[in-house]
Amino acid sequence: MALDEAIACSVRQGGSPATLRFFGWLKPSVSLGAFQKISDIDTRWCADHNVPIVRRPTGGRGILHNDELTYSFSARDDGLFSTGLLDAYRKISSAFALGMRKI
């Protein structure tokens, strides 16, 4: 998650282009949403079962990750997505399709 924050910061500051990152998890892990309370998670169970808990820079609820492909997407909003929501979805979907072909 720290890498996603670093990428987003670099994109925001103009040091990197829009970036789509695909990644997996080495072992089962829980990711908490940016504003979610840690008390929402059974931390004792996670510790007893060696399940790490990390915090995402994005919102939402806790997610148990295991044997999956995860992605993050960072882009500035200064023109790339200025033509409307539907066009933004098309551009992001095209990036996903290209990324999946390269995997």
Where on the chain are the PLM-derived regions?
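Active-site loop/lid in soluble adenylation, ligation, and acyl-transfer enzymes
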Residues: 1-48, 52-56
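Alpha-helical protein-protein interaction elements
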Residues: 14-15, 63, 81, 88
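A glycine-rich, hydrophobic loop/mini-helix early in the fold
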Residues: 40-80
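Contiguous, small/hydrophobic- and glycine-enriched helical/loop subdomains that border
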Residues: 68-103
